[in-house]
Amino acid sequence: MLPMRFFRNRVFTLANVASLLMFFGMFGSIFLLAQFFQTVQGYSPFGAGLRILPWTLAPMFIAPVAGALSDRISPRLIIGLGLTLQSVALAWIGLVSTPTVPYSQLIAPFIVAGVGMALFFAPVANVVLSAVRPIEEGKASGANNTIRELGGVFGVAVLAAVFSHVGGYQSLEAFSDGMNTAVLVGAAVVALGAVAAFAMPGSGRRPEIEAAEPDPLAQAA
């Protein structure tokens, strides 16, 4: 069972709020962009995936650096910066994507989005784990992973609904209009995640073990 007292810790709660909002905007937008490349610009599914690689591959190179920086700089600043870059990139994509937009105009915002995503991943995991006792890290990690997945699920559902309401598949222009509006909504949601990240307390110390809640493994022994 997930101890509800975890959520009395502002660091844990705000880190998970930021995770929820980040995955909401990111996955909802990637879902629509993959369709944009196929439906509007005529690429195959494989070709669409290749074109999103500047975004999705960046964490492979940047995340280790972000993790190291989080040991020297306040993690909330790195997480907040990552979410800010992600929000800016989504807004950029939402403003320039037309049926005839050259792919070259999307590379820069994709790279910015990838850097933002990379700056977010490792530090937020460290923050979540540092907010609980060592023996409870598994529960905290599981909670964060579940919240991320829920963010992605709701992001795809809500942004797809925005897309359908504003645009649709009637024409290439209708698809672009719907997608751009949905991606801009995603950018706004991720910006709220940045606010949550910057609002996190700066202390990364683990909470003291509470006498009222003894270690269950110690009790069993």
PLM feature spans:
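Small-residue-rich alpha-helical segments with characteristic i,i+4
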Residues: 106-177, 181
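Symmetry-related core transmembrane helices of the 12-TM Major Facilitator Superfamily/SLC fold
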Residues: 181-198
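Juxtamembrane/transmembrane-helix interface segments of polytopic membrane transporters
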Residues: 34, 90-97, 152, 156-169, ...
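Transmembrane core module of solute transporters
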Residues: 1-139, 218-219
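MFS transmembrane alpha-helix packing/gate-lining sites
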Residues: 58-62, 147, 151, 189
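Hydrophobic alpha-helical transmembrane segments in multi-pass membrane proteins
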Residues: 23, 27, 31, 86, ...
